[in-house]
């Protein structure tokens, strides 16, 4: 099946040394099982949020700063108007170690209500990290993720939250106060 698609505008700038800036505004989404564009909603498995609340304005901005050869620092801010806002801080370190590479990916999301809070209460802080040793075509990693706050981490219904459990087919692991560990071989 095809992935979901969004309608809107996106700009990227690499005009400053070591800095990539991103900004965009989306007003509609076409789900995988649909033939038309619709307003966006918050994912609401098990009734976590008001999944019927809609928005036609998702804005985001942020950037990636290449601090040094192995280290990239990241910050992004996003708002789904009237539903939720989210800040993201992260760093990615990818350095040689022995005959391979050690990759460490740390992510921190801070989420709260936005505007009229039509999706309901949003109170979440999600910390996740994954450390992976890569040697040739093989990689072995270990990760941990912890959610704090009174609610799950919000994200746009039909999209994929990138929080540290990519490739896990059983769950998105975003419930309130949830803690997960993973060991992964690719």
Regions found by a protein language model. Give the residues of each.
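Transmembrane beta-strands of outer-membrane beta-barrel proteins
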Residues: 22-26, 36, 64, 74-78, ...
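Repeated loop/turn-to-beta-strand initiation elements of outer-membrane beta-barrel proteins
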Residues: 18-22, 30, 69-74, 98-104, ...
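Residues on the lipid-exposed face of transmembrane beta-strands in outer-membrane beta-barrel proteins
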Residues: 9-13, 61-65, 89-93, 129-133, ...
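C-terminal structural cap/anchor segments
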Residues: 149-186
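Outer-membrane beta-barrel translocator domains and adjoining extracellular loop/strand segments
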Residues: 33-40, 86-90, 115-123, 152-158
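Residues that define the transmembrane beta-barrel architecture of outer-membrane proteins
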Residues: 3-7, 55-59, 83-87, 123-127, ...
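Outer-membrane beta-barrel strand-turn architecture
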Residues: 13-17, 65-69, 79, 95-99, ...
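Transmembrane beta-strands of outer-membrane beta-barrel pores
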Residues: 1, 25-29, 77-81, 95, ...
């Amino acid at each position: 099946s095809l992935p979901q698609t969004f309608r809107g505008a996106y700009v990227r700038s690499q005009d400053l040394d070591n800095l990539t800036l991103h900004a965009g505004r989306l007003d509609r989404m076409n789900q995988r099982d649909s033939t038309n564009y619709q307003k966006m909603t918050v994912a609401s498995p098990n009734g976590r949020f008001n999944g019927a609340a809609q928005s036609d304005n998702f804005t985001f901005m942020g950037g990636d700063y290449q601090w040094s050869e192995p280290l990239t620092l990241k910050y992004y801010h996003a708002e789904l108007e009237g539903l939720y806002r989210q800040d993201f801080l992260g760093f990615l370190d990818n350095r040689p170690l022995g005959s391979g590479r050690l990759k460490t990916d740390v992510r921190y999301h801070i989420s709260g209500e936005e505007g009229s809070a039509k999706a309901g209460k949003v109170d979440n802080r999600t910390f996740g990290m994954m450390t992976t040793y890569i040697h040739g075509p093989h990689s072995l990693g270990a990760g941990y993720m912890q959610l704090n706050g009174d609610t799950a981490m919000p994200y746009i219904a039909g999209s994929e939250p990138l929080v540290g459990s990519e490739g896990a087919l059983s769950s998105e692991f975003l419930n309130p106060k949830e803690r997960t560990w993973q060991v992964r071989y690719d």
